[in-house]
Amino acid sequence: MSLINWDDFSDDHVTEKKPAAATSKAVKNTETVPATSTAPVIATVEPADQQQDQNLGSKAEHEEHEEHEANTGLEALEMGAARVTVDAKQMINCRADLNQLVPFKYKWAWQKYLDACANHWMPNEINMAADVALWKDPNGLTDDERTIFKRSLGFFSTADSLVANNLVLAVYRHITNPECRQYLLRQAFEEALHTHAYQYIVESLGLDEGEIFNMYRETPVVANKSAWVLRHTKNLADPDFKTGTTEADQQLLSNLIAFYAVTEGIFFYVGFVQMLSFGRRNKLTGAAEQIQYILRDESMHLNFGIDMINQIKLENPHLWTTEFQEKMQALILEGVELEIQYARDTMPRGVLGLNANMFEDYLKYIANRRLAQLGLTEQFDGITNPFPWMSEIIDLKKEKNFFETRVTEYKTGGALNWD
């Protein structure tokens, strides 16, 4: 399948709707709640309150910094240049040599890369025979179940291509730290692997490839989400876009929040719950097992992205203004509204023990998690997780796959945590 082009969508595809909750609570100032990781993100920088005192009023220093362009790793060789030190490294706008992986500054990024490599899997390892038999049985699944399954595949199959495009064509270019770039390369491979998995499921079940892979063009609620992703990420792929000014750096930070907190952290979760619900009922267990592994990968992508965003905030506190925080809060809530619309469209009736109201509660629960991880105020009071079994599926500290279709051993999977 060819990669998707940013020109395929215009802003008109996105339904603009600002949820009332976006302004219902005050935004926190600079509190940071890092994603759970093997090493705290703040371990490499000074505490946020000290960073504020030293940097928020340092306009002259920031203007001096803006005079220099960041390295890309493609600069001409400079013989006899000084060796890279840890202190010279930074997440964005770094002028140190990006081709030198060590010494590490962000050890958490390197550990996530190692964990991802240890959790490697391939779609064709998973037996789809039972899925094929069930799908071919005219009485095996209801029409609603078949629609939900195909709708989820339709969004997933192109969304991971959009994610890969943004990683390769935009994010990698502007993150100026080699250990983080190392993880981004692994993430890009995993996005390709996920697209491979969707193709493997489609081919195994004999589904109409055109129907599945064109759903992002032909089904409005899928198109709305894809268009939203493109609208919030395409600017960074412009060859003329450069970081180094407050406006440009905030554009990058906004892209990362839209990319990780919303696209990776919200837009996939209705589909994840729906697909995994089949496996819980011993239906389509081969496909559900692959979705479980994809969910595991995506949870690591999300945690890495949150840690990277928080690191940028700590190193560049002048970017994290009250006005910018309000914009990011509204951006996340806009994504939640789109995903709620998607849930209601895909589940007009209760199926698999699920219904649209449960998904609305779940998405608000997820949104509170994302807001808190970024140091923003939670917007939905009294919300609990209506799908506690999702935590069991995501928990990697086990020797057997959740659906018991094959034995798996995760060497370092226990280092990961859903939160």
Region spans (language model):
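N-terminal intrinsically disordered, low-complexity tails
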Residues: 6-63
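Non-heme di-metal
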Residues: 136, 143-419
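Membrane-interacting alpha-helical segments
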Residues: 61-81, 145-147
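Intrinsic structural disorder/low-complexity segments
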Residues: 53, 65-68, 304
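Amphipathic alpha-helical packing elements
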Residues: 71-135
